[in-house]
Swiss-Prot record:
This is Inner nuclear membrane protein Man1. The gene is Lemd3. Residues 717-736 bind DNA. Keywords: DNA-binding, Membrane, Nucleus, Phosphoprotein, Transmembrane, Transmembrane helix. Interacts with SMAD1, SMAD2, SMAD3 and SMAD5. Binds to both phosphorylated and unphosphorylated R-SMADS. Residues 308-317 have a biased composition (Polar residues). One of its GO terms (molecular function) is DNA binding. It comes from Mus musculus. One of its GO terms (biological process) is blood vessel endothelial cell migration involved in intussusceptive angiogenesis.
């Protein structure tokens, strides 16, 4: 009867109740629609039946649990099969993900002897994580709630906490103590805890008051007592004798990575529940679990796994906070925390832990359990379940890559998996961990380097860091790459500067070049001179050339006003050098005059442009190659280059000014043209309105003087500025507007030019009247910045199509639909249009046959002016569209405009015709 009632109850649930019930069972449902509701109801019915079966099995198991404390287990296979509710092999992930595996694992957990302790532990969840249905969900719910993470006050049992992950709210009633169990004395005396520093502590004088979750802790402690008595005797060895193993016992969630959600509400719900950050760890932890099928075979159980498992659960009971067996505490705290815990634990009394010897939770640096910014650095809960995953310090301590509980593995030097004894590589104590012997894998070291060496990043950066791990770029490489271009540019500039300076320095010493020219006289006269006179003549030319070059150089550098040297001064200069030079001076001068080539010395008469015909006409000698010092040449070159650069810049500025002025003139002409057209439209509206008023009131004159129309349209302060626009509008009306006739009338005793509106026929008036709902052109052109390159979905959401406050009547939305169909008249893929009549943003929803048709409609509508409003379009997901408009599921017939006249496009045709007429005129 109860089963029938439970089966029929889901049919009467509302959408909200159905959603909450599925969430209570650990599922992550999507939107409840007509198509998904039957699937969700069937799933809820099945889960309720499994829940009732588990409750019945738990009650039967609790009655048979009387003498379980003295029972022994025969082998490690039985041990691992019962401790975690008969979980499958580590590689059998498909079994964990299936609903059948969920029910069978839960049932086997209820039947195991460990599942029903003296306090009656709750049912163990099979998969250890939520089941994600194959629908698009609005939430990502892969992490327990803060209440469940707190563990009921910080001391909740492991199985109770694991059960809270999936079957929330299920608690079996406590069973009476068994006859074979110890009922007197302190719990610490009965359980005989072995602290991880190796010394047994006496129990405290008084038991600690139980916390909110102490009942579940006591149940797990009783179970561990029975487990500890049946373990191998080697388990009594101290924990530091064992090797620290990098045991990654993590398995991926039962909801595989393909079951993702692309809903926009997913981010909002995920932020409210705090469940987004752990979900991102699924991709990372799948890679950690790939080594498990070949590394988790059962082997003889060692002291390491046996005693560490026992100490871990016992300390979690009495210490008020669980120390995870495979902690990764170094990612959340410093390495010195382990030493602080060890020193504090070595003090007598254990600090109020009820004889446990562990520090209380308050002595540990406080971190928010399950905080979103810490969650990406922590490992997600494994399917086999850890007894301390949901404790208050669980997220803090679960980041230590060593076995032994707490921070034990941090301070144990030289303990690695490659030196473990043969018996230490067995599977962990009853299903609590699976050891991964790959202690030096690259992924693990990368993870630790990320956790230890980097500060906490914001959530988007953490997501990118976890999903796209790559080698860090060294600061030295980035520094050199940053300054490489600057260094190359500086080197190039220095090279050309040095080259130019060297060139300038070489230009200043041109004597050998000139000497080469002198040695080659280019005629036969030089060969007729005797050999003894040749050397003297060459020496005279050299001396004279150097003197003239020095004088010319001093003049160019501004240190001398004399540029040339007279013939008498040249003769006196050579005479001072020696009497032999004076004798050959005339011969040298004659040779220079007759040679006619540029040998560095030029003969000049009384004027610089005077033609010399005789040697007697030569009055001055001038150097054609001034010899200037290096700094003088550099200064002259700098002045020359600066002068030329200034001229170049001036030319560029003049060109820019000319282009700017031309652009200004073009822009001004375009603006004046636009203002002229606007003025024409205003004049026509005034004349049409005046004509309508004349038909209603016969006393009005059927014409209007031009100055009156101008004064009514242009403000007094703008009339001078708008005079040119007004004159162009008047000329345009006179030449191109047939409905306006210009006449001369006497008004008030003076002659005025007036405009008379000529009434057109009724049929023509109807076609020329611009309707209220019209497309008014494109606001901007579509490009990559404002339009996606590919069509995303077949559904569109259009904004600013109307203003619900200004709309009148009951069928105004039909005009909106008709306008969209007319605008997209060449699109045969629109199958559904919905107008949200109450939307303040003027939203219209459009569904097309395919994303290609939606992209075509997007390009036609986005950025257009409609009824004075700028229309914007965005893509909408198909499932959200069907959730909003279920009737659109069956729409597959393309829609066509009902009116063939295309009234909404008449304004565009009118403007196009006006522009064409203006261009032809």
């Amino acid at each position: 009867m109860a089963a029938a009632t439970a089966a029929a109850a889901p049919q009467q649930l509302s959408d909200e109740e159905l959603f909450s019930q599925l969430r209570r069972y650990g599922l992550s449902p999507g939107p409840v629609t007509e198509s998904t509701r039957p699937v969700y109801l069937k799933k809820l019915k099945k889960l309720r039946e499994e829940e009732q079966q588990q409750q019945q099995q738990q009650q039967q198991q609790q009655h048979r649990a009387g003498g379980r404390g003295n029972k022994t287990r025969n082998s490690n296979n039985n041990n691992t099969a019962t401790a975690m509710g008969g979980r499958p092999g580590s590689g059998d992930l498909a079994y964990l993900r299936s609903p059948a595996g969920l029910g069978r694992l839960s049932a086997s957990a209820a039947e195991s002897p460990v599942a029903g302790g003296s306090g009656g532990a709750a049912a163990v969840p099979a998969a250890g994580s939520k089941v994600l249905l194959g629908f698009s969900s609005d939430e990502s719910d892969v992490e327990a709630s803060p209440r469940e993470q707190a563990g009921g006050g910080g001391g909740g049992g492991a199985r109770r906490d694991r059960a809270a992950l999936q079957y929330r709210g299920l608690r079996a009633p406590p069973a009476p103590p068994a006859a074979g169990e110890v009922t007197g004395g302190h719990p610490g005396e009965r359980r005989k805890p072995h602290s991880w520093w190796g010394a047994r502590r006496p129990a405290g004088p008084e038991p600690q008051p139980p916390a909110a979750g102490s009942d579940g802790a006591a149940e797990d402690a009783d179970e561990e007592l029975a487990d500890g008595e049946d373990r191998d005797p080697e388990a009594e060895e101290p924990l530091w004798a064992s090797r620290a193993v990098n045991g990654s016992r993590l398995l991926p969630y039962s909801s595989c990575r393909e079951h993702y959600s692309d809903s926009e509400e997913e981010e909002e719900e995920g932020e409210e529940d705090g469940d987004v950050a752990p979900a991102r760890q699924v991709l990372k932890d799948d890679s950690l679990a790939r080594h498990r099928p070949r590394r988790s075979h059962s082997k003889p159980f060692s002291a390491l796994t046996a005693k560490s498992g026992g100490s871990r659960q016992e300390t979690s009971v009495q210490g008020g906070g669980a120390l995870a067996m495979n902690d990764r505490a170094a990612a959340a705290g410093s390495l010195d925390r382990s030493r602080n815990l060890e020193e504090a634990a070595a003090e007598p009394g254990g600090g109020g832990g009820g004889g446990c010897g562990c520090d209380p939770v308050d002595s540990i640096p406080r971190y928010r359990a399950g905080a979103k910014k810490l969650a990406p650095l922590l490992s997600p809960p494994s399917p086999d379940g850890d007894s301390t995953l949901e404790s208050p310090t669980g997220p803090l301590l679960k980041t230590n890559n060593h076995i032994g509980g707490g921070a034990f593995g941090v301070d144990s030097p030289g303990l690695y998996a490659n030196s473990l004894p043969p018996g230490a590589t067995a599977a962990a104590a009853p299903g609590t961990l699976r050891i991964n012997h790959a202690n030096h894998t690259g992924s693990n070291h990368t993870y630790l380097k990320t956790a230890y060496g980097k500060p906490k990043l914001c959530e988007p950066e953490e997501e990118l860091l976890q999903q796209f791990k790559r080698e860090e770029v060294s600061p030295t490489g980035s520094f050199s790459a940053h300054y490489l271009s600057m260094f190359l540019l500086t080197a190039a500039c220095l090279f050309f500067l040095i080259l130019g300076l060297t060139y300038l320095g070489m230009r200043g010493t041109g004597v050998p070049e000139d000497g080469g020219l002198i040695k080659n006289p280019f005629d036969e006269t030089f060969g007729k001179i005797q050999e003894s006179e040749k050397n003297l003549l060459m020496s005279t030319l050299y001396k004279l050339h150097d003197r003239l070059a020095q004088i010319a150089g001093d003049h160019e550098c501004g240190s001398s006003s004399q540029r040339m040297l007279s013939v008498q001064e040249a003769a006196a200069y050579l005479k001072n050098l020696g009497p032999e030079y004076e004798d050959v001076f005339n011969t040298s001068l004659l040779w220079i005059f007759k040679n006619g080539k540029d040998v560095g010395i030029r003969c000049v008469g009384y004027g610089p442009e005077e033609d010399l015909t005789n040697i007697t006409d030569v009055q001055f000698l001038q150097s054609t190659r001034p010899q200037m010092p290096f700094w003088c040449r550099f200064r002259r070159a700098f002045i020359t280059v600066t002068h030329r650069l200034l001229l170049l810049c001036l030319g560029v500025v003049l060109v820019c000014v000319a282009l700017r002025y031309m652009r200004y003139r073009w822009t001004k002409e375009e603006e004046e043209t636009r203002q002229m057209y606007d003025m024409v439209v205003k004049i026509i509206d005034v004349l049409r309105s005046h004509n309508e008023a004349c038909q209603e009131t016969k006393d009005l004159q059927p014409y209007m003087p031009l100055p009156h129309v101008r004064d009514s349209l242009i403000q007094p302060q703008d009339r001078k500025k708008m005079k040119k626009v007004w004159d162009r509008a008047v000329d345009f009306l006179a030449a191109n507007e047939s409905r306006v006739r210009t006449e001369t009338r006497r008004v008030g005793g003076a002659d005025f030019l007036v405009w008379r509106w000529i009434q057109p026929s009724a049929s023509c008036d109807k076609t020329l009247v611009i309707p209220s709902k019209v497309w008014q052109g494109q606001a901007f052109h579509l490009d990559r910045r404002n339009s996606p390159p590919n069509s995303l979905t077949p559904c569109l959401k259009i904004r600013n199509m109307f203003d619900p406050v200004m709309e009148i009547g009951d069928h105004w939305h039909l005009a909106i639909q008709e306008a969209i169909l007319e605008k997209c008249s060449d699109n045969d893929g629109i199958v559904h249009i919905a107008v949200d009549r109450n939307s303040r943003e003027g939203c219209v929803y459009v569904k097309c046959l395919s994303p290609e048709y939606a992209g075509k409609a997007f390009k036609a509508l986005h950025g257009s002016w409609f009824d004075g409003k700028l229309v914007t379009v965005k893509y909408l997901r198909l499932d959200r569209y069907h959730h909003r408009f279920p009737q659109a599921l069956t729409c597959n017939t393309p829609l066509k405009p009902a009116n063939k006249h295309m009234n909404s496009l008449s304004h565009l045709r009118l403007r196009t015709g006006l522009a064409n007429s203006q261009g032809s005129s």
